[in-house]
Amino acid sequence: MPINRLQLNITSLASDETTWKKPKTIAIIIAWSVINVGILMYVFLFAGQSMEWYFMTLLFAVSVYAGAILEDIKAIILGGFEALALTIILAYVLMIIPALIGQISGFYQQNLVLTIALGFLFRMMFPLGIVLIVIGGLIGGLLEGWLT
């Protein structure tokens, strides 16, 4: 009986490391984003309109740790930008929830909330936030490679 070309070889699939790294990489990127969103939301709700140095240090430390866990330079670079995009999207959605659910009445008031949230994210993430997240991930990957 001839073997179909589309038939999977289970033993080679089980021995392939990249197959099992994919869910781990996705989980790390999501966790990286959620922690970054937590830091940004704390600043948005309690710390005012300026991001102090210790919040930037937290963003950098989380990125170093995520880069050390990810290990692969390609996963770190792509994952850093994916985490950054997911962070911005999640933080923006969380900031505009009152306008989305109708707690803020009036078209102009809703647009004001959307504009304030976008302005806050722009001030917090561009350019220093992006640089800290990407460079922190790269440094974490380099540290992990150097320590092993």
Regions found by a protein language model. Give the residues of each.
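Short, charged juxtamembrane terminal tails flanking transmembrane helices
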Residues: 1-9, 141-148
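N-terminal signal-anchor transmembrane alpha-helix
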Residues: 2-55
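Alpha-helical transmembrane segments of multipass membrane proteins
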Residues: 32-40, 86-91, 132, 136, ...
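Membrane-interfacial segments
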Residues: 43, 47-48, 74, 94, ...
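Canonical alpha-helical transmembrane segments
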Residues: 56-80
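Hydrophobic alpha-helical membrane-insertion segments
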Residues: 74-97
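Hydrophobic alpha-helical transmembrane segments
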Residues: 75, 116-139
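Membrane-interfacial helical/loop segments at transmembrane boundaries in membrane proteins
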Residues: 101-120
